[in-house]
């Protein structure tokens, strides 16, 4: 984005802030109480009181004008502000002319000005002021007809011509009337401009809704108005004005405790309307986004923005603040009560920010521990941030317990802080395990089990804390004050933080238990089998001192195969289904005998030949699995699909065809004593026990 685009974006926000401030002022202004005060006072004869109903209607007209100013396009909004500046300049010229005429009346001198130094000074000052006003007006209105704005110079010209003072007063009034007529002419000539703008805007909105829909229209207006930045700037202006007002009326220095109270009170003062509350929500969102961005920058440097240029974070904290403010009725409270409640809500927001920081830091710290990066600065940044996330939530929970009375919301804050500290502790423990494994020459076999136990312990504690929060919330709902919003929060908390976590943990436990049972059911290889196999583990590519043998005759480390079985229940090489002892017993009881084997058993060869024996021995050594099975691949179909394909073959190959096929091959081998290549293309089916089919 260039400098021009940045300037236009800043102007787009700055020009719309006054419309939000006008809406805020109109919301604060109670018209009914204002006129009641006038009625009780001696001003009930005031013309404003006589037209109070017109004033009430103008109050609503002010809302409409504010919305119009808020939604105007930037070019038209800039023109409107320029016209407003020109009107202010004309008013300044009128004031300069009126002050000059008044000072001349008070002096009573009507002679030549060069003979009276004070009169000459007054004339020069008024002349310079009028020239500046005329020049600025011509620049603002972008016209070279400077005489249009020089009507207020007529009293100066009259004084220069030695016209009497009484006549100069009349000339000044004429100049004022002439300027007013110019303004009225300008307004009349542009009277249809708002109507034309509204007509064109309605036409464009109708086209957008017809083509893209209401949602696209809302998103387009949201982006064009830059609503989050607009409300944030509006709230910051309010907050700065509140702080300035306080310090401008105080002469004594403020203590540290007083500054904290001033900070909370000023925030509470800036949350008395829905518009200021929205401003605080977006401000908190941007503050959270800035903190999380700094956190990621501290951990990864500029690489964080290269990998993740758009961080859509921070809205969670803002929405949390908005929900809590609406649920507790923050706007309707008094300033002191609002400041107290706002401090609790801000504690909840800070706890949410800390949890988001941990979500950013956790994968980065674990990846750094598992990698071979030996940069001490990177490790220091990761560990220091984890230590901060370990200590600060605990300190915050301690301070809450010290200064506040315990209730449901404070229990949620404390539980969130404790869980954050526990999760950081688990992350540091896993990081230490990774670093220990890094400095060891041989890998630690049970490091994954230790990591699982650490994470499982944290998840169990997290589940128990969530369960305690739900129990406390239910007890407060039953025996205390019942609210719909509180019940909804308890229900949502119970579903997401209790029920779903319990389901996920139980499913993980069942998968690990099933994997352990499968590993125990597999036979352990002997040293002779390992020497005969003479291969490495196909999962970790390390030498095997001990291994288990799958039903498809593949060798793996027990720990490596167990990790694989945590994810899926197939062989890593051939993707055959690996079943436990109970599953194998059920499968064997339901299996049928292969018809080719039965036929060979009923009709054995009567005259075994040496060539036939050699041939059968050679065929017996042919591996049942192809060479593609020597590396794990995910492109091979699992065993279920192989069984389905075998079923398709059984549909096309009948029992008699298979028997005649095998008999013809055996007779040809017995008569010729040789095996032809076409003899290997037999349509007989393999036995069911041979799960590893050819690929």
UniProtKB/Swiss-Prot annotation:
Residues 589-604 have a biased composition (Polar residues). It comes from the Eukaryota. InterPro entries: HRD1_E3_ubiq-ligases (IPR050731), RNF145_RING-H2 (IPR047823), TRC8_N_dom (IPR025754), Znf_RING (IPR001841), Znf_RING-CH (IPR011016), Znf_RING/FYVE/PHD (IPR013083). The chain crosses the membrane at residues 53-73, 77-97, 123-143, 146-166, 168-188, 225-245, 275-295, 316-336, 340-360, 384-404, 410-430, 460-480, 482-502. It is a multi-pass membrane protein. The keyword Nucleotide-binding does not apply. The keyword Transmembrane applies. Keywords: Membrane, Metal-binding, Transmembrane, Transmembrane helix, Zinc, Zinc-finger. GO terms for molecular function: ubiquitin protein ligase activity; zinc ion binding. This is RING finger protein 145.
